[in-house]
Design a protein with these regions (language model features):
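Alpha-helical transmembrane bundles and membrane-interface segments of multipass inner-membrane proteins
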Residues: 1-151
Length: 151
C-alpha cells in the first residue's frame, strides 16, 4: 500500500506540473477549494525546516512509525503504509528536484488549495490520515489495557 501511495502521489504531481501554472489559483468550489501549484521548501503544509533537517526527520519518523505498533491488525498496517508512502512520496520530490550540492534539498510540489490552509498534496494527506489513524489505534489500545487491569 505504501508503494501505491507513492505512485499515486508522483503521478498526480506529474499531471499537475503539466497543466497548472505556478501560483495561479484554479477554483473548484468557489474560492474555498481549488488547485494552486506551489513549490514547498519546508515540511508538510509549508512548515519551514532547514533543508538538512527534513531528510533526517523523515528517516526518524519512518523508523518510529514502523516500530510504534506491534501487532496492530489491518488498520495498523494501513496507517503505517499511509505514513511511510506519504513520507517517501515527498522525499522523492526532494531528490528529483534537488539542487547541485544539496541532494535532498529539492522542493516538494503542493497543489491542493483549501481556503487559507497551507497548500498540500496526496503525500501530505496520506501522512495526516495515517498519523490520525495511528493515534486512534494507540488510544484504543490504551483503553483495552485499562479495561484489562483489575479494579
Amino acid at each position: 500500500m505504501a508503494a501505491a501511495v507513492v505512485v499515486v502521489d508522483q503521478a498526480v504531481k506529474v499531471a499537475v506540473l503539466e497543466v497548472l501554472t505556478p501560483g495561479r489559483f484554479v477554483p473548484l468550489l468557489g474560492d474555498a477549494v481549488g488547485w494552486q501549484l506551489v513549490f514547498n521548501p519546508g515540511a508538510a503544509f509549508g512548515i519551514p525546516l532547514p533543508a538538512p533537517v527534513f531528510p533526517v526527520a523523515t528517516v526518524v519518523v519512518l523508523v518510529a512509525v514502523l516500530r510504534s505498533l506491534g501487532e496492530t491488525g489491518r488498520a495498523g498496517v494501513v496507517a503505517q503504509a499511509l505514513v511511510v508512502g506519504g513520507a517517501l512520496g515527498n522525499l522523492a520530490d526532494r531528490v528529483v528536484r534537488a539542487t547541485p550540492g544539496d541532494p535532498l534539498g529539492g522542493l516538494v510540489v503542493d497543489y491542493v488549495a483549501w481556503g487559507s490552509f497551507p497548500r498540500f498534496n496526496v503525500a501530505d494527506a496520506a501522512i495526516t490520515v495515517g498519523v490520525v489513524l495511528l493515534l486512534v489505534l494507540l488510544l484504543l489500545e490504551e483503553r483495552r489495557e485499562r479495561a484489562r487491569q483489575p479494579a
